[in-house]
Amino acid sequence: MKIATIAKYVDQPMILNKLDNKMPKLLILAGGTLGVADSIKTAKKDKKNAKKKLVQNAIIISSTIGASLLGTRGLKIRNKKVFNGLMERVDFSKLQKMQTKAVDKFLDKVQVSDKDVLNALNTAKVKELSPKQIDILTNKLPESPAKEELFSVILPKKKNLNSKEIFSEIKRLSLLGLVPVVGGVGGGIIADRLTNPSKNEKSSTSAKKRIANKVKEGLYQYLANIFLCNVGAGTALFISERLENAKKIKPLTPMKKLVVILSGITATGIIGGSYIANYVSKKCIDPLFGEAKSKKLYSERKPEALDIALHADDIATAGILSGFKWIEPALPFMYFVSGYRAGIGYRNGKKDNEQDKKVRVS
């Protein structure tokens, strides 16, 4: 089976619709599994705080997932749209009507006698095409304006973004990443207030420290793992487009474009992201919460293996900017860990930091 056929298969509007509809369930399942596993781990090491950890995890995970779903899907109350989501969504029934109309219009213009082609066209009216049916339509239908118009609906080509569209998409993707992080920080602060009531000045100072950690980790996750990577991807793609227009480089294929984007992500996000995030925390957030200045930039938060793993969402960003639409429904799932880590106020630099000790509750 050709790679091009697989790419067309997963980028079908009806496949994207199914992936989008399954994402909330997968997100809730993943979040619930993480919360239960972490709570069980805490119970084994610190039974006294096990219940508290369970409550905190439930609040943080719920707020992160809730914010993510609101951001992607928008809000509707009594069938009235309050605000739109950041991801384009089309009802399956509407897709069926659109594809049925496109197929009928094609058959009005072109006579088709091949049974395999007719079966594939009838399938396209109600559900996604199989890889075999995609090959049949691609190879057996002669090239014509009618075929091109049909394929623009049932098998749309990857969109080649121009510079203006690139930065518009970067803005949207950055907002998609920001929403779960804000949800995680907000949920973390609420969870902390509910499970750690301030009884005296000492506990009040400790609570302030925990809030500061959540804000700093939220900033770290957003800048290092999301925003700066998006900026790097967009900038690299913008520069390559300018070079291509000036005939300095050959036209970029989708795979070459992917390499260019990943290079931009590596330069700005993976290499410079943690430095910039920690620098902003030291200069802005620490003074805001009255924390003592530290000479070492990585005294509280240093990059680790999981941070590299979290850059899987940057590969997804690269895929979207390169025109691979099937990746987009998975973005809320990929951003979830960033939101959760922000919510618990994860810190790994100081040995005496309470978030670094797994037996303690964030």
What are these regions (language model features)?
Residues 1-362:
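Glycine-rich, hydrophobic membrane-spanning regions of integral membrane proteins that mediate transport
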